[in-house]
Regions:
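Glycine-rich, Lys/Arg-enriched anion-binding loops that position phosphate/diphosphate groups
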Residues: 279
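Short, small/polar-rich motifs associated with maturation and membrane association
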Residues: 1-253, 265-267
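Extracellular/periplasmic, surface-exposed regions of secreted and cell-surface proteins
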Residues: 37, 212, 255-264, 269-274, ...
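Residue-level signal for secondary-structure boundary sites
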Residues: 8, 22, 136, 150-152, ...
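Core alpha/beta catalytic barrel or barrel-like domain that forms the active/cofactor pocket
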Residues: 284, 299-301, 379-380, 492
């Protein structure tokens, strides 16, 4: 059972469905406390803990605001299972969006100890415990920080003088006439009016981007009630000018524990998040690519007139690409609510025996709306004095995608822990039932003439609509036995019996056992008496079975697939 006392977490480590003393661990478990987590300030929790746990590998694959796509693995394997406050959550993206100021500890199960989570534990497990209140006067804390980011290295590109010189040399070396005359080359080299070098990167990107995070929290408690609450805000800006790409996140958390009677304790944990990402229609990579591909002799505006974006020969004008009002934009938003209600009862007259029931309800609402606007770029005729328009992104397009999901998880847990002289034994049994539902719908329409970004204002012909729903269900029985003799000799046996909706009725259940032993050599007299500088030396061994809930569901049903195209007749497909 996860204890509500924050102080107790100082010398214990959160493991699957419980806590254990550090010195009693028999598995490979890394642990980070709150001070280690918040020491590094970053928009993503993954970046904040990078490099702080042995065997934990985190590779940031995308620095774009709102893209929580860091690759997280334990000991080089695949993505681990993520457990937040005792509940299996939606994976790496949700973990990375957590407010670091709300976290008390993170445990990393690296070996067979992860088997207690059964299916989907093949790559280890990451267990997050959020802050709980502690006895004491109310404490109000305000944390705020501002960060500045900049590219590690930006490739240096040729300017107009260098570019034209190399173009001329390339043509001459190939036995062809020079690309431009000597007089024109001199003008490019001197930067004469109309022959200025254009740095497209500087025209589109700032040298630095800003980040801001703040959290206001309140915590405290008495012998009857303990509480922790917080509100957080974070923003992450990109290098793009005009604030074309931004991410904003609002979070709240409320963890309250109430001692109803001497033996009965209730807890209510609430967590919520609302975050939005605003970006141009064009992907960040395409914008960056445009600043690299187009030559430095092409100006942003035709005839240097800011009313006319210049028409580029290779890829679209990057300045037009980041102008959301002109070329289109996209907005992504998430609404997430996590609720957890628990009752814990210490059984009278049976010392060390307690039972706990937990009900979890999570809700997530996702929306994505993107508008591609048709736009024009121009070429200026020096002799005619006229602007010739070229169309791009026609016809205009609107995409509107929605997804709604909910999770219901019920856990019943029995714990027994008792010390008899030099012997300490522990036993845990958990029954868990988890159910998840989701539905989604995607719509797309094109415009004959763009007015406002709503599907009803676009044409009905050539529209695309898709959608579906899913229903998942899981049952689990979990057991664990621990033994400790004099704090020297340690043993643990654990097992999980998992059932998944994904497979055929006769093959839905799987058994995941694990065993581990430990020997605290530092507690032996021959170490204590001769090597006083050794305070904790342990030899341990673990083995277990883990799995992966892989594959599409209901593949055991017979089905058929028609060949593409043609018609279906009574005798077959033609």
């Amino acid at each position: 059972v996860l204890e509500e006392n924050v102080v107790a977490l100082g010398d214990v480590v959160v493991v699957g469905y419980g806590i254990q003393k550090k010195e009693s661990l028999t598995g490979a478990i890394g642990n980070l406390k709150v001070d280690d987590i918040v020491k590094t300030k970053a928009p993503s929790l993954a970046q904040a803990i990078q490099g702080k746990v042995a065997g934990l590998r985190i590779r940031q694959e995308n620095g774009e605001p709102g893209k929580f796509s860091s690759n997280i693995n334990v000991r080089g394997f695949g993505t681990p299972l993520f457990v937040i406050d005792g509940v299996v959550r939606d994976g790496s993206s949700e973990f990375q969006r957590l407010n670091p100021e709300d976290i008390e500890s993170i445990s990393f199960l690296k070996d067979a100890t992860a088997s207690i989570y059964g299916m989907n534990s093949a790559n280890g497990a990451v267990i997050v415990t959020t802050k709980k209140g502690a006895t004491g006067k109310p404490r109000i804390t305000l944390n705020a920080n501002v960060g500045i980011t900049s590219p590690t290295n930006v490739p240096e590109m040729a300017n107009a003088r260098q570019y034209m010189t190399m173009r001329n040399e390339a043509e001459i070396n190939a036995g062809r006439p020079a690309y431009i005359t000597k007089d024109e080359l001199t003008k490019w080299q001197q930067g004469a009016p109309g022959y200025e070098s254009v740095d497209l990167y500087d025209a589109v990107f700032n040298k630095h981007a800003t980040q801001f995070q703040t959290t206001l929290s309140l915590e405290g408690g008495t012998d009857k009630v303990s509480y922790y609450g917080s509100f957080g805000y974070a923003t992450d800006n990109s290098l793009l000018k005009n604030n074309a790409l931004t991410y904003d996140k609002y979070t709240f958390r409320s963890n309250v524990s109430l001692k109803i009677t001497k033996d009965l304790t209730a807890s209510i944990n609430l967590g919520g998040r609302y975050d939005t990402t605003n970006r141009p229609w064009f992907p960040f990579y395409d914008i960056f690519k445009s600043t690299r591909v187009n030559p430095p002799t092409t100006s942003i505006y035709a005839n240097d007139n800011p009313d006319y974006y210049n028409n580029f020969s290779y890829v679209p004008n990057p300045a037009a690409m980041i102008d959301a009002d002109y070329t289109g934009s996209a907005k992504e938003r998430n609404k997430n609510l996590q609720t957890q209600f628990a009752l814990e009862y210490n059984i009278p007259y049976v010392k060390g025996l307690k039972v706990k029931g937990t009900f979890i309800y999570d809700y997530n609402n996702y929306g994505y709306k993107a508008t591609r606007k048709g736009f024009k770029t121009y070429t200026y005729g020096e002799y005619t004095g006229e602007y010739t328009a070229a169309d791009a992104n026609y016809p205009a397009l609107l995409q509107d995608n929605r997804r709604e999901s909910e999770r219901v998880d019920m856990q019943f847990q029995t714990n027994y822990n008792r010390t008899f002289g030099n012997h300490t034994i522990g036993a845990t049994y958990v029954f868990e039932r988890r159910e998840e539902k989701a539905n989604w719908m995607n719509g797309e329409r094109k415009f004959d003439f763009f007015t406002i970004g709503e599907l009803d204002n676009a044409r009905e012909s050539d529209q695309k609509v898709s959608g579906s729903s899913e229903h998942q269900a899981y049952l689990s029985h979990i057991g664990r036995l621990t033994y400790d003799y004099k704090g020297k000799y340690l043993a643990e046996l654990a097992c999980r019996y998992d059932g998944s909706y994904r497979y055929a009725p006769g093959s839905r259940w799987a058994f995941f056992p694990s065993a581990s032993v430990g020997w605290r050599i530092s507690e032996e007299s021959f170490i204590k008496d001769n090597f006083k500088f050794v305070d904790n030396l342990k030899l341990r061994f673990s083995a277990g079975r883990s799995g992966q809930d892989a594959g599409d569901p209901f593949q055991y049903f017979s089905g058929y697939t028609l060949n593409s195209g043609g018609y279906v007749f009574s005798q077959g497909n033609y």
